[in-house]
Amino acid sequence: MGLKHLIEKLEPHFTHGGKLEKYYPLYEAAATIFYTPGQVTRGAAHVRDAIDLKRMMILVWFAVFPAMFWGMYNVGLQTIPALHKLYGAEQLQQAIANNWHYSVAQWLGVSFSADAGWLSMMTLGAVFFLPIYITVFIVGGFWEVLFAIVRKHEINEGFFVTSILFALIVPPTLPLWQAALGISFGVVIAKEIFGGTGRNFLNPALAGRAFLFFAYPAQISGDLVWTAADGFSGATPLSQWASGGGEALVNVATGVPVSWMDAFLGNIPGSIGEVSTLMIFIGGAIILFGRVASWRIVAGVMIGMIATATLFNVIGSDTNPMFAMPWYWHLVLGGFAFGMMFMATDPVSASFTDKGKWSYGVLIGVMCVLIRVVNPAYPEGMMLAILFANLFAPLFDYLVVQANIKRRKSRG
């Protein structure tokens, strides 16, 4: 019996009148993973295309894999030197025994020696990342299924993307219960309350992170959360620049200065998926060439960031080192690159019109640099910049449409 035949045989049990009718969203979600939906458009007008919502979301899901795998490797790369800086040999073994992440990693064969190989670093990073991702996926999926069953509609595949994006923009040390709480806020409050996928005006992953930032700032920001070594305090390069300028950039664990290439490749502490600009650009190219993301938004964000950073460079300041940060450093530090490629380009919460996309992107770039430079308490500005632009996206589209209407009336 083939898989397709099995799926077709089970379908009557889940359709109207079947014993499992109320669970049809679960059946439909599983069936359309393997095969395209059987329904076709019968009336005019419609578009024939090789991609549907599920496959579009899966493309984005795969596109973040380069940043995800590098992020896991980087967690180990930052953690092992930090552990050796904190502990001697005997103390390190005690620390491993007292931390379940380290214990699981050691059981999996991870070497905690100073010369540990890339596989040990990757495995250690996976031990921190995968529990966060699995927690977020299960909790987010639960809410998606619950709302689909109650509303009697198909399960929206957006949670595939929302879950992995959320897991990649948080620190590796985030408690699992906070990960569950954050994704619950993002899915329920920022998306499902407004009608689900396609109707939300805020990016759910960013909304969930913003909730954690304001509700539990100690676990989502500061100097203690970016390196997964118990008791280790190390600021991100963005925070270091904010306090001491470019000369202050140094890897706290190794004592080695941080170069621009280190930041571009991702050899710095930070949120799991935001550290490597190179890997983010590789994934971003996939969704840009796949036409899932809009190049106009990406270009607008870059233009807004470069113009605003250059303006602050020209103005200068004797008391605020952030005024002197060049645009190419803004690009590789913090969550700018990840936000530009995967958050700002969210087709639901971004502007729809071409001109609106330019305005939307420029606003994000301007606001990100403005928050980073002018706000001394919050050196990272990409999250708030995108959420702020989400609120203005409908206005940009409205103004573009009204301008088109006026132009057509003037012709006639």
UniProtKB/Swiss-Prot annotation:
GO terms for biological process: respiratory electron transport chain; sodium ion transport; transmembrane transport. InterPro entries: NqrB (IPR010966), NqrB/RnfD (IPR004338). Its cofactor is FMN. Keywords: Cell inner membrane, Cell membrane, Flavoprotein, FMN, Ion transport, Membrane, NAD, Phosphoprotein, Sodium, Sodium transport, Translocase, Transmembrane, Transmembrane helix, Transport, Ubiquinone. Its main location: membrane. It is found in: Cell inner membrane. Its EC number is 7.2.1.1. The chain crosses the membrane at residues 57-77, 127-147, 163-183, 270-290, 297-317, 322-342, 358-378, 381-401. The modification FMN phosphoryl threonine is found at T236. It is a multi-pass membrane protein. GO terms for cellular component: plasma membrane. NQR complex catalyzes the reduction of ubiquinone-1 to ubiquinol by two successive reactions, coupled with the transport of Na(+) ions from the cytoplasm to the periplasm. NqrA to NqrE are probably involved in the second step, the conversion of ubisemiquinone to ubiquinol. Composed of six subunits; NqrA, NqrB, NqrC, NqrD, NqrE and NqrF. PANTHER family: ELECTRON TRANSPORT COMPLEX PROTEIN RNFD, NA(+)-TRANSLOCATING NADH-QUINONE REDUCTASE SUBUNIT B. This is Na(+)-translocating NADH-quinone reductase subunit B. It comes from Klebsiella pneumoniae subsp. pneumoniae (strain ATCC 700721 / MGH 78578).
